[in-house]
């Protein structure tokens, strides 16, 4: 470690403070010490090394005939202790090997133990040992790096050293050890005078070696590190870590300081000077500080500090050259009177936080003080301070406009206009270490901004948001980010640093999510606000070594104009190779425009504040997209340069504003207390279809609030918007919501309920066939449900296996338009009046902890002989009793038992319900569209919708082939496949479906594990080891299969038609109806 001793001398009479920095080279340095003195000191200090601090190394020396080792040994059985190195002759073989330190103990020479030898015997042995000398050396391990010291901070630097023999002119000790108590960093314990490291001048005793020629020395033993150094070329690039002192005296100084620094004769301080103007007077300022120099390490001087005097000589009338010459003429102790930079200019913070108060000390640089020409400024005679002039001057400081570009004249900063203002400064936190800051709670992880609107640059109304960005760079070029914050590098920041500059064609620019002026909140989880600018830069440099960094940034989003509906234009700046941040989706439905399906947070598109998912893209640069495909639109965008003009249409249904068509929006907070919410939500996997509440449990939590009703649309769950999210994501959010669930509800004051279609109506007489596309869109927007028939997911064991009435005969995805009855009592009445259940059901997901609503299910007891002649039998005692039992459990407070039942249902364990899960049949009648779920003697039926969609001719032909197939039947099976250890595979391949989502068995190796397990070609894989794969493609499913281990548990869907093998997977697996096909492209 490299230490500095600080002595404070308070001079109350003259109003000055004095700080003295004396260099202490630590216990390993011997350059300027008398060898005899070292010997005596070591005798008193080190008779032996405690085991926990003892290190051992092997030193091999090759001496020429007639030459000596240049090594002085003291000790022996007849002397004062164990044999040890008491002196190394400068220029001798032992000194130039750079492997020995004075004070090292010699245990053995060429395998001969020295413990029981007298002093003369040891000397004789060394003289007659031969050309090759192998020494076993014990040394004291270097002290560990302090973890919680707030008085120093580490920095790193790369230096290049020339090799001299097999070494670079320094001794290092430490390294990894099998006993973790003895593991240390590789620490420099001695720099040989005149050696390569000494001539270069940067490396000092106490510095840690991190890397050599790109080879990391982390967790490397001392022996391996020496071997790496010997194998280096003639020029080695070293990355070293050194310590910089944090001087509270300097940071908290209220006026000039007298700084005394001791340096080695012939060495330089490591500062360069320049001239500047302060209060209309020319001053000498520190322009730059050389990294790892004496000045940098002491932490007392910083760029921007004013030098008032050098060794008592005033610099008021000195030129830059004269001041530099004056510094160079000082041999050892340098005495400088400085004015720290934070007292010579405005602090980097908004003007309302600037506080100017009268100083008790008057110096030659004050505008109201007559300077008396004396080399001792403390002896100046000063007149009485003029309060009035001081007050006026303070007013002018506070009234001055402040911006991030106002520090352009400050050394070390360049003028950059920021489009984001610094945040309001909070009270400065106490200085903490990086480890403590890493454990601090983040306050910026909300996905929705909770901050209120503020006024930004130019009077624009903005709000702040934050996001996390992953950048990938390289150690040579980094990430392309330059930061700005504070006055000097070691000042503790009271607000996060700003991004000052983004390098062209760097990872930061190419990601398209960063802009100049953004606030950097954290780097790899470490908050930047309580650290220093140098620490932030160091974190970026360290992250570059691993080629990856996670940045949390805060930025401004404009909200001066936020259109709720209508058509408008948006202009976005575009740079070559940088994404706009929008993802567009194309719908196959004729006449439907392209849709913005996603917007990257932090992108140019997001910061405008006017675009949101669901907006329609009508034109790009005045080129209408009516007849353009998504690929054409992408091509048009790629050809745009500098500025992109987008024509956008926002529908009222895509707006969350309360002013839209009489909607009322409010927030409801539900506290579960371990119980169920009591709601059933419905929706589809289409990203912009609404998610509504389709059922409420009688006397349940949601119903008791009186604020939630059937038909209400859910806009957000726990402040996470559902816009652009499918039903599955909404379900996941509810499952992960915890004890408190906050729902943002949108209620239509005038609800339009869908009219039920006649039971006798067939597909050809669908009344919606006569509607135009725009009328269909309007109608669907009035209905709270637009797709997927209803299957209650309380039986999650079925849903987890891919069984869903919204999926075709093979469990494939069929996005079909359906409605929902919003009045359960009407539904129940209609069931009593008619044997045919309602035509339109929705895909519903109740959150009732496993309770079943009687009205949600139809339970026929036998399969009808005629497709259109379904007979409904109300002898459904099992399901009625089961549902009533669950309701009784809920009302009597048995929530724990309810949760156990829910757990068994959610994990797919049908056996827990007393049902036979060995085989589940889903039979689809080709004419009536009725779907039956059969389990043992219990049957559940629901109806498929009868909407006819406009299909392409090719799709129609495939559909007709499926309709012509005889009584298609779907069988769902659980299959276990054991891996073949000889071939290390499961013996089958998979492929994607052609007309629908899903993964299917493609080929099976005869006699292989899959063949022996009963797997068949064309089986659809619905679940892999309890992971649903029904909506996956091969890219997502194959990794699951690869990581399955030796056992594969599959849930498959198998078609039993006699024509299955003849028609092929694309025909059998194809859905009976197809409304839309959506593809996406990220721009």
UniProtKB/Swiss-Prot annotation:
Compositional bias annotation for Polar residues: 408-422, 774-783
Primary location class: cytoplasm
Localization of this protein: Cytoplasm
Domain of life: Eukaryota
Tissue-level expression: Enriched in the mitochondrial cloud of stage I oocytes, before becoming concentrated at the tip of the vegetal cortex in stage II oocytes. Expression becomes localized to the germ plasm of stage III-IV oocytes and early cleavage stages. At the tailbud stage, localizes to the migrating primordial germ cells (PGCs) until PGC migration is complete (stage 40), at which point expression disappears. In the adult, expressed in the brain, ovary, eye, muscle, spinal cord and very weakly in adipocytes.
Function: Plays an important role in primordial germ cell (PGC) maintenance and efficiency of PGC migration.
Protein name per Swiss-Prot or TrEMBL: Glutamate receptor-interacting protein 2
Organism of this sequence: Xenopus laevis (African clawed frog)
């Amino acid at each position: 470690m490299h230490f500095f001793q600080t002595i404070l001398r308070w001079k109350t009479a003259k109003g000055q403070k004095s700080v003295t920095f004396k260099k202490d080279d630590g216990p390993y340095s011997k350059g300027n010490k008398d060898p005899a003195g070292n010997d005596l000191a070591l005798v008193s200090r080190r008779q032996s090394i405690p085991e926990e601090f003892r290190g051992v190394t092997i030193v091999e020396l090759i001496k020429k005939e007639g030459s000596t080792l240049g090594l002085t040994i003291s000790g022996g059985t007849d002397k004062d202790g164990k044999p040890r190195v008491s002196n190394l002759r400068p220029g001798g073989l032992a000194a130039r090997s750079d492997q020995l330190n004075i004070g090292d103990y010699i245990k053995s020479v060429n395998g001969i133990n020295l413990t029981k030898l007298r002093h003369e015997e040891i000397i004789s042995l060394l003289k007659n040992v031969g050309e090759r000398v192998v020494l076993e050396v014990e040394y004291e391990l270097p002290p560990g790096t302090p973890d919680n010291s707030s008085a120093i901070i580490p920095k790193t630097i790369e230096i290049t050293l020339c090799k001299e023999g097999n070494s670079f002119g320094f001794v290092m000790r430490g390294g990894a050890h099998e006993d973790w108590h003895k593991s240390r960093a590789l620490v420099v314990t001695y720099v040989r005078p005149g050696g390569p490291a000494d001539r270069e001048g940067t490396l000092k005793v106490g510095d840690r070696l991190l890397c050599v020629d790109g080879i990391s020395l982390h967790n490397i033993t001392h022996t391996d590190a020496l071997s790496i150094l010997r194998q280096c070329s003639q020029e080695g690039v070293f990355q070293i870590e050194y310590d910089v002192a944090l001087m509270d005296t300097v940071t908290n100084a209220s006026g000039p300081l007298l700084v005394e620094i001791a340096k080695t004769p012939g060495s330089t301080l490591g500062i360069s000077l320049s001239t500047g103007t302060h209060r209309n007077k020319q001053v000498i300022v520190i322009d730059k500080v050389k990294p790892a120099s004496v000045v940098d390490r002491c932490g007392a001087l910083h760029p921007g500090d004013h030098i008032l005097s050098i060794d008592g000589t005033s610099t008021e009338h000195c030129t830059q050259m004269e001041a530099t010459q004056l510094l160079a003429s000082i041999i050892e102790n340098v005495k400088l009177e400085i004015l720290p930079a934070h007292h010579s200019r405005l602090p980097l913070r908004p003007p309302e936080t600037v506080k100017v108060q009268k100083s008790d000390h008057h110096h030659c640089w004050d505008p109201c003080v007559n300077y008396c020409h004396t080399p001792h400024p403390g002896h100046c005679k000063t007149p009485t301070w003029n309060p009035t002039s001081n007050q006026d001057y303070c007013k002018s400081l506070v009234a001055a406009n402040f911006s991030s570009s106002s520090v352009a004249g400050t050394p070390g900063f360049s003028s950059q206009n920021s489009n984001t203002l610094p945040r309001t400064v909070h009270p400065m936190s106490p200085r903490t270490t990086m480890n403590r800051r890493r454990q601090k709670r983040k306050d910026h992880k909300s996905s929705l901004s909770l901050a209120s609107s503020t006024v930004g640059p130019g009077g624009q109304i903005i709000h702040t948001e934050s996001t996390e960005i992953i950048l990938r760079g390289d150690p040579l070029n980094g990430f392309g980010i330059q930061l700005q914050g504070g006055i000097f590098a070691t000042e503790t920041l009271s607000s996060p640093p700003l991004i000052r500059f983004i390098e062209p064609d760097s990872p930061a620019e190419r990601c398209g999510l960063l802009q100049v002026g953004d606030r950097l909140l954290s780097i790899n989880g470490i908050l930047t606000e309580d650290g220093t600018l140098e620490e932030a830069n160091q974190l970026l440099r360290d992250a570059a070594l691993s080629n990856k960094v996670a940045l949390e940034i805060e930025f401004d989003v404009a909200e001066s104009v936020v259109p709720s509906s209508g058509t408008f234009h948006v202009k976005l700046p575009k740079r070559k190779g940088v994404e706009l941040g929008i993802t567009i989706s194309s719908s196959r439905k004729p006449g439907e425009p392209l849709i913005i399906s996603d917007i990257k947070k932090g992108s140019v598109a997001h910061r405008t504040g006017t675009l949101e998912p669901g907006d329609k893209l009508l034109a790009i640069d005045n080129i209408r997209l009516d007849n353009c495909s998504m690929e054409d639109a992408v091509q048009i965008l790629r050809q745009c340069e500098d500025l992109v003009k987008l024509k956008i249409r926002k529908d009222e249904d895509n707006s969350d504003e309360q002013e839209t068509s009489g909607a009322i929006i409010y927030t409801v907070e539900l506290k579960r207390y371990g119980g169920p919410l009591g709601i059933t939500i419905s929706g589809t996997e289409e990203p912009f279809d609404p998610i509504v509440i389709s059922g409420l449990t009688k006397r349940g939590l949601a119903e008791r609030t009186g604020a939630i009703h059937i038909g209400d649309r859910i806009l957000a769950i726990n402040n996470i918007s559902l816009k652009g999210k499918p039903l599955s994501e909404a379900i996941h959010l509810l499952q992960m919501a915890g004890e408190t669930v906050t729902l943002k509800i949108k209620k239509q004051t005038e609800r339009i309920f869908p009219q039920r279609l006649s039971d006798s109506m067939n597909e050809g007489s669908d009344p919606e066939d006569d509607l135009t596309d725009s009328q269909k869109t309007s109608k669907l927007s009035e209905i709270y449900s637009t797709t997927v028939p209803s299957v209650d997911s309380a039986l999650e064991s079925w849903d987890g296996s891919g069984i869903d009435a919204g999926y075709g005969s093979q469990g494939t995805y069929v996005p079909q338009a359906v409605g929902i009855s919003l009045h359960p009592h009407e539904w129940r009445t209609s069931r009593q009046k008619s044997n045919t259940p309602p035509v339109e059901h929705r895909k519903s997901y109740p959150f009732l902890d496993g309770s079943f609503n009687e009205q949600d299910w139809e339970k026929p007891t036998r399969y009808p002989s005629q497709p259109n002649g379904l007979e409904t039998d109300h002898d459904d005692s099992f399901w009625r009793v089961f549902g009533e039992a669950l309701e009784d459990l809920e009302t009597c407070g048995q929530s724990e038992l309810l949760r156990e039942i829910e757990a068994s249902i959610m994990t797919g364990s049908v056996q827990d319900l007393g049902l036979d899960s060995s085989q589940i049949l889903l039979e689809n009648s080709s004419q009536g569209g009725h779907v039956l779920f059969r389990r043992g003697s219990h049957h559940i039926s629901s109806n498929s919708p009868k909407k006819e969609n406009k299909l392409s001719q090719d799709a129609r032909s495939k559909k007709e082939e499926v309709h012509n197939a005889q009584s298609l039947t779907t069988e769902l099976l659980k299959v276990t496949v054991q891996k073949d250890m000889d071939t290390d595979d499961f013996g089958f391949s998979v492929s994607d479906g052609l007309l629908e989502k899903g993964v299917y068995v493609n080929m099976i190796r005869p006699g292989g594990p899959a063949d022996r397990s009963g797997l068949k070609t064309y089986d659809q894989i619905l679940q892999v080891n309890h992971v649903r794969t029904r909506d996956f493609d091969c890219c997502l499913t194959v990794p699951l299969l690869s990581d399955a281990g030796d056992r594969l548990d599959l849930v498959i869907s198998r078609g039993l038609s006699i024509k299955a093998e003849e028609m092929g997977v694309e025909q059998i697996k194809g859905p009976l109806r197809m409304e839309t096909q959506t593809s996406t492209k990220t721009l």
